[in-house]
């Protein structure tokens, strides 16, 4: 995000892309203003939380009028650095990795996977979704200045790969493996364990489904 913006709570920062996506849809439909109640219904975040999130950035709307869609869209585009492209490297071209490469964040103009790594000789040297696949041994040579990585590799190799990424100056890792990665404090890791998320969903459906 833009370093000139005020520091905001992490929970708020995670919701900003959600707001931005909805505002893009509103803009595309020709809508010129939106209320916090409408935003709340669309993104499934309560109105009070939305107003508090927006308050960290000053007066973005007017009471009784709502929010100007074009203004908000422009503001959040700048806040989220949507005019700058962040290049990403993906590790592990299995089923999940292949899905990422074919999708390649097509709805997010500022994020793009530009290279992938694997050890399968049938995949190395090919392109998946237009993205070149290199051998893992080429990591140090090919990574260059990329600072964001996605891991979709077997759990047992996640930490060794992470250690190499740390040495290359990586700043952020989106980890889809069950492994809990150990990194220096200045490196950001988001763990996404799909099996755990699914188990959690099933549990809540069984025990809290009627609430």
From Swiss-Prot:
**InterPro entries according to UniProt:** CoA-bd, NAD(P)-bd_dom_sf, Rex_DNA-bd_C_dom, Tscrpt_rep_Rex, WH-like_DNA-bd_sf, WH_DNA-bd_sf
User: Single GO molecular-function term?
Assistant: DNA-binding transcription factor activity
Protein's cellular compartments: Cytoplasm
Claim: Transferase is one of the keywords in the record: no
SUPFAM superfamilies assigned to the protein according to its UniProt record, in alphabetical order: NAD(P)-binding Rossmann-fold domains, Winged helix' DNA-binding domain
Where exactly are the transmembrane stretches of this chain? none
Question: Which SMART domains does the UniProt entry name for this protein?
Answer: CoA_binding
Record-annotated DNA-binding residue ranges: 18-57
Q: Which GO terms describe its cellular component?
A: cytoplasm
What's the superkingdom here? Bacteria
Q: Could you say which residues bind NAD(+) here?
A: 92-97
Q: Name one GO biological process term.
A: response to redox state
Assembly with partners or alone? Homodimer.
Instruction: Note the NCBIfam families from the entry.
Output: PRK05472.1-3, PRK05472.1-5, PRK05472.2-3, PRK05472.2-4, PRK05472.2-5
To which protein family does this belong?
Belongs to the transcriptional regulatory Rex family.
What is the name attached to this protein's record?
A: Redox-sensing transcriptional repressor Rex
Q: Which gene encodes it?
A: rex
């Amino acid at each position: 995000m833009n370093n000139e913006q005020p520091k905001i709570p992490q929970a708020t920062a995670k919701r900003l892309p959600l707001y931005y996506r909805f505002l893009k849809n509103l803009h595309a439909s020709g809508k010129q203003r939106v209320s916090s109640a409408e935003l709340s219904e669309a993104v499934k975040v309560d109105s009070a939380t939305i107003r508090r999130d927006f308050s960290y950035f000053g007066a973005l709307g007017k009471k009784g009028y709502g929010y100007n869609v074009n203004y908000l869209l422009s503001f959040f585009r700048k806040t989220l650095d949507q005019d700058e492209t962040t290049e990403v490297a993906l590790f592990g071209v299995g089923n999940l990795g292949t899905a990422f490469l074919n999708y390649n964040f097509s709805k997010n103009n500022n994020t793009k996977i530009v290279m992938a790594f694997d050890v399968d000789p049938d995949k190395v040297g090919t392109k998946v979704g237009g993205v070149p696949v290199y051998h893992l041994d080429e990591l140090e040579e090919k990574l260059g200045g990329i600072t964001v990585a996605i891991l979709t590799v077997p759990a047992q190799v996640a930490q060794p790969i992470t250690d190499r990424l740390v040495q290359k100056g990586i700043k952020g890792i989106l980890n889809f493996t069950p492994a809990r990665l150990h990194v220096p404090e200045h490196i950001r890791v988001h763990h996404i364990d799909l099996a755990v998320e699914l188990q959690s969903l099933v549990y809540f459906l069984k025990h809290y489904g009627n609430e």
